Amino acid sequence: MPRSHGNESARLTGRQTARHCPTGLPGLIRDVSGRTPNRTAARCGSDSLSYRQLEVWSDAVARTLRDCAPKGLPVVVAVPRSTALLAALLGVLKAGLPYLPVDPDDPPARLAGVLETAGSRVALVNARTLPVLAGQGLRPVEVEALRGAPDAPDVELDPLPDVPAEQPAYVMFTSGSTGTPKGVVLPSMALCNRLLWMRDAYDVVPEDRILQKTPVTFDVSGWELWLPLITGATCVFLPPEEHRDPALVACAIQEHGITLCHFIPSMLREFLRRPEAGRCGSLRHVFCSGEALPVAVARGFAALLPARLHNLYGPTEAAIEVTHWTCPERAEDIDRILIGQPIDNCVLGVFDPDGRPVPDGDEGELYIGGMPLALGYLNRQDLTDRAFVPADADASVRTWYRTGDRVRLLDAGLEYLGRVDDQVKIRGQRIEPQEVEHHLASHPEVAAGVVVAARVGEDRELVAWIQPAEGSAQALTHGGAVRRLREHLADLVPPGYVPTHFLAATELPLTSSGKQDRKLLQQRAEQRLNAHRPAPRAGEAGEAQAQDVLGEIWCEALPHAETYPDSQTEEIAAAPTDDTTGRVSAAWAEVLKRENVPIEANFFDLGGHSFKLFELQNALERHTGVRLSVVDLFSHTTVAAQATLIRDGVPSDDGSAVVGRAAPARRARALRARRQRSRD
C-alpha cells in the first residue's frame, strides 16, 4: 500500500472541477442535439448523419437492446468504421449497457475466450461480421436494419430512461500476463471527465472536424468518437483500411478540413515523410499516445506543420489518457519529451518499491487515482485486487492503480522512463510477453520461449527466443519451423502479437536470481538484427535509413546446425515468369534481405509487418516505377498478386486503371468504389 507520510513532493493533482454529468454521455450528446439537430454529426465517405438522425437511429438501437440484451452484460459491437458504428455504440450506452468492441478477424479461440469472460449474449453486427458472431453463439442485431429513412417524420415515443454516470460505459480487453486477455471496465463518469477536460483544454468548437481512424478496439477511439458529439463538431470517419496508409490519411485531412487528429508516434513518423503531409494546414491540434514519442519525430513535426503537437499518456485502466504535455512550437527548442501534467480530477503519485513517495527528480513507479480510474477487470477480482490498491488514510484518493511505468517528476512535469515489468508496446499495441510465451510453450517443438522487444533500426519489433524441446533441435532448424510457429500463434493471438523475428538458443540465459535474463536477450537480439542492416543509400535521408533483416534468422545456432533463414531451405522459390514479377521479387528481396522470394509466399509469413510495408512501397516504386497504396499492399500480400496489380492497374471509380504516382485522393476514390462494388 502506498504511504503518503505527509510528503506531497511526489504527488501531482490535476485541476479539481465539479463535473456534473447526471445522465452520462448520452445526456451530454442529447443536449447538443437539441440545440443543433440539423448540424452534421458524422460523415463517412458519401454517407452523413445529422444530430437528429443520430439520435433517432441510436434510440432504435437502444430500444431493441432493452428488449433482448440481458441487463448488466456487455453488448458486443462488431461494426466497421462508419456512421452505423456511431449509432451502435451510442445505442448501447442509451440502453444502460457497456459496449464491448471486438475485432472479428481475431483468432476464433481468442475471440471465444473474450466472449466467455464477458458473458455477452447479444452482438451488434453488419452483413460481413454477422456470420462470425452468430457462430460464437451470440444473438446478432444488424444495425443498418434499424436505420430509418433520412426524411422520415419524427415519431413520438416514450423517452428512454436516463442512464446514471456511474454505469459502466465500455469494456476494453487488453493483453494478459497469464495468457488470457483481461477486460477493463470503464465507468461513464470517467469517460465524461476525460472528454470535458479535452473540450476545455483545447477549445474544441462546433466548427472543428475530428478524424476518427483508430480501431474501436483501442481506447483512443473513444475521444475521436465522442469529443465531436459533446461539442457540436463533426466526426469524420476514415473508411475501413485507409488508416494504414499515411498518404490516404493526409488526403482525408485535406479533403475534409480536419482540425484535430491522433497518431501513434511510429505512424506520425511515416506520415511526416509523405509529401502530402506538408499540405495539411487545416490541423490545429495533433495528439500522440500509445508509445514513447521520439524527439526527432516531434522536431520533424514542428518544422513541417503550424499545428500544435501534444504528447498524451494513459493506460487502458484509466479513461483513455491521464496526462498531457504540449511540445514547444520551435523544433530547436525540443530537447526532451515529457508526459507532463495530470488532466482534470486526476491525482498522480510516484512511489518507490516499498510504497514510499520518492523525492522530486528521483525515479519511481507511477500510480493513478481519482475520477479517471476504471472499475477494475471484468469478472477477475483477483487481478483487480492486485492492480487497484487502497490508498492510506492521508491520501486524497481512495484507490490507486499501479501502472508499472517508471517515471520521474521534473519541474515541467513527468518524464516517462520505461517499465518496472516486462510489458511492451509495439506500434502502439500493448503486449504482455508472457501471453505470447504461454502460447509458444504449448507448441510441441518448444521447451521454453522468451519474448522481448528489440530496437531494429528505427522501430521496436517483437523477437521470440526459442529453446527447443528435447529431440526437436533438428526440426527447429530445418523444415519450416518458423512457418509452423507463426501458424501456431496465428490461431491463438492477434496478428500484432506474432513476433517478427524468431531466434534459437540451446539454453536461455538466467540472471543471478534464476530468472530469464530478458535484458541480455534483448541486447543479443539487437546486436544480431542490426548487424545485418546496410548503410543508407545516398539521398535517402527522408526515408527509413535502412532495411530490416529477415524475420526468420536463427542467430544462436544449435549444435551442428548452421545459421540460415529457415524457410529458404524449405521452399524453392518459383522463378519470376515475366519482367514485372522479377522487379517485384527484387523489391521484396531488398526489403526482406532474402536471396530468393517464393512468388506465392505471404509477405507477413516472411517476417514482414505493417510498418515494413512502407519500405516495400518505396522499394516497389524504385524497381517498377509504380507506387501502390499501402491498402493495396495489405490486400495483395504475395509477389504474384502485386505483380498482377501493377500490370493491370488498380480499377478506379471511372473504370480506368490507377497506376504510377496517382494522386492519393484518386486512389482513395478507387478503393471506396471497389468496396462499394463488393457490397453490391
Protein language model annotation of sequence segments:
Residues M1-M172, L186-P187, N193, P294-A298, ...:
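AMP-binding/adenylate-forming domain of the ANL superfamily
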Residues M1-G14, G24-L25, R63, A123-P161, ...:
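AMP-dependent adenylate-forming
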Residues R3, L160-D162, P168, T511-S513, ...:
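Regions immediately C-terminal to embedded phosphopantetheine-bearing carrier domains
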Residues T36, T117, S188, A201, ...:
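Acidic-histidine catalytic/liganding microenvironments
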Residues D31, T117, V132, G300, ...:
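Amphipathic alpha-helical regulatory segments at dimerization interfaces
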